[in-house]
C-alpha cells in the first residue's frame, strides 16, 4: 500500500451578500481542503462542515489531525468509513480519495462510480429569508432558474407572504421551501395549506431534528424532505413513514461514498432522493454533481452566492448546473 502525502489547508469563502435562514445569518464561511498525493497523482476534497452540529473548521482540523497517520497509510474509501466519523473531515478525505483513485485509473470519477456519462442537472436556486418584496425581486432576477427554493424562518404569516410574493413573481417556476427546523408541530396544518395554495412542490425539514415523532400520522399532500433529520446512512431507514425524500449532503454524511450508499438505501425503501449542499466552492460541488446524477431533486447552487469562486468552476446555464471533469474528478 503506497503511503500518501496529506495536505490540509483552510480557506475563507466570502459571500457576495449576507444570506439568512432560520436562526442564522451567514456573511462568510471557512472550508477545509484536503489534498492527497502518491508522488504521481493527487486528489482533492473540500468540506465546509455542519454548522448546527459544531462541525466547524477547528473541529474538522482536530479530527483530521488525530487520523493523519491512518489517512497517510492510504486506506480504501470503505476503510475510511471506519477511520473517520460522518462529517466534514471525512467528506474532504473521501472526495480526495475518489479523485486520486480515478486519476490512477485514468478515468473520470463518474466512470469509477459505475455511472453513465453525466448530464447537466436542473438545480434549485435558493432565496435567503428576507422581506417578501425583496425575495420576489431576487426571484425575478434568477431569470434562468426553473426551480427555486425559498428559505423560511418559522414566522408563519410572514413565511406565507414570502411564498406568495415569490409565486407571484415567478408563476412559471417549481417552488420548494426549506424550514431549516424553524417550525413547531402546531403550525404544520396551516403551513401546508398555505403552501398548497401557492403550488409548492416540496417542504423541507419543517421541524427540529429530534422532533421526528411529531410527524407521525401527518398526511401531507406536499412531499416532506428530511435534511437535518437525516445526517448519514443510519438515519435513512428510520425516516420511512415520516419523510418522503432524503436530502443528502456530503458534509453531513461524510463524502461521496456514503452519499451513494444513502441514495441506494433510499431507493430500496421507496424514498425520493435529493442532493443538497452546505455551501462551498465549485470544488465542493463536483462530487455532489456525481451524486446528483442519481437524484430526483438537485440543490447545487452554492457557488452563485460567493464573491469569488474557484476557476475552473461549475457552470449554470438555462437553470441547469454542469460540473466538468476539469473542476473535479478527472479527465473526460
Question: What is each PLM-predicted segment?
Answer:
Residues 150, 155-293, 307-319:
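Catalytic core of soluble alpha/beta enzymes
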Residues 296-299:
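Short helix/strand-capping turn motifs
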Residues 1-175, 182-186, 193-196, 310-332:
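N-terminal capping/lid subdomain adjacent to the active-site entrance of alpha/beta enzymes
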Residues 303:
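Active-site cofactor/co-catalyst pockets and adjacent glycine-rich loops in catalytic enzymes
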Amino acid at each position: 500500500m503506497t503511503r500518501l502525502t496529506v495536505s490540509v489547508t483552510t480557506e475563507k469563502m466570502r459571500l457576495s451578500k449576507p444570506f439568512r435562514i432560520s436562526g442564522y445569518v451567514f456573511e462568510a464561511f471557512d472550508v477545509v481542503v484536503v489534498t492527497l498525493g502518491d508522488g504521481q497523482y493527487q486528489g482533492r476534497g473540500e468540506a465546509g462542515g455542519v454548522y448546527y452540529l459544531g462541525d466547524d473548521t477547528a473541529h474538522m482540523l482536530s479530527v483530521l489531525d488525530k487520523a493523519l497517520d491512518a489517512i497517510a497509510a492510504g486506506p480504501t474509501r470503505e476503510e475510511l468509513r471506519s477511520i473517520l466519523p460522518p462529517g466534514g473531515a471525512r467528506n474532504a478525505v473521501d472526495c480526495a480519495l475518489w479523485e486520486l483513485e480515478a486519476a490512477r485509473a485514468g478515468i473520470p470519477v463518474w466512470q469509477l462510480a459505475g455511472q453513465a456519462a453525466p448530464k447537466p442537472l436542473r438545480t434549485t436556486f435558493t432565496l435567503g429569508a428576507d422581506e417578501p418584496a425583496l425575495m420576489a425581486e431576487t426571484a425575478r432576477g434568477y431569470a434562468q432558474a426553473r426551480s427555486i427554493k425559498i428559505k423560511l424562518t418559522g414566522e408563519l404569516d410572514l413565511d406565507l407572504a414570502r411564498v406568495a410574493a415569490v409565486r407571484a413573481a415567478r408563476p412559471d417556476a417549481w417552488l420548494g421551501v426549506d424550514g431549516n427546523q424553524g417550525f413547531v408541530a402546531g403550525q404544520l396544518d396551516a403551513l401546508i395549506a398555505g403552501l398548497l395554495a401557492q403550488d409548492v412542490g416540496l417542504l423541507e425539514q419543517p421541524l427540529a431534528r429530534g422532533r421526528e415523532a411529531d410527524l407521525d400520522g401527518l398526511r401531507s399532500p406536499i412531499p416532506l424532505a428530511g435534511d437535518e433529520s437525516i445526517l448519514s446512512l443510519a438515519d435513512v431507514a428510520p425516516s420511512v413513514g415520516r419523510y418522503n425524500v432524503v436530502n443528502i449532503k456530503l458534509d453531513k454524511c461524510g463524502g461521496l461514498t456514503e452519499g451513494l450508499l444513502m441514495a441506494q438505501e433510499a431507493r430500496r425503501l421507496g424514498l425520493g432522493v435529493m442532493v443538497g449542499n452546505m455551501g462551498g466552492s465549485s470544488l465542493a460541488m463536483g462530487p455532489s454533481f456525481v451524486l446528483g446524477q442519481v437524484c430526483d431533486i438537485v440543490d447545487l447552487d452554492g457557488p452563485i452566492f460567493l464573491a469569488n469562486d474557484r476557476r475552473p468552476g461549475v457552470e449554470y446555464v438555462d437553470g441547469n448546473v454542469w460540473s466538468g471533469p476539469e473542476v473535479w474528478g478527472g479527465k473526460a
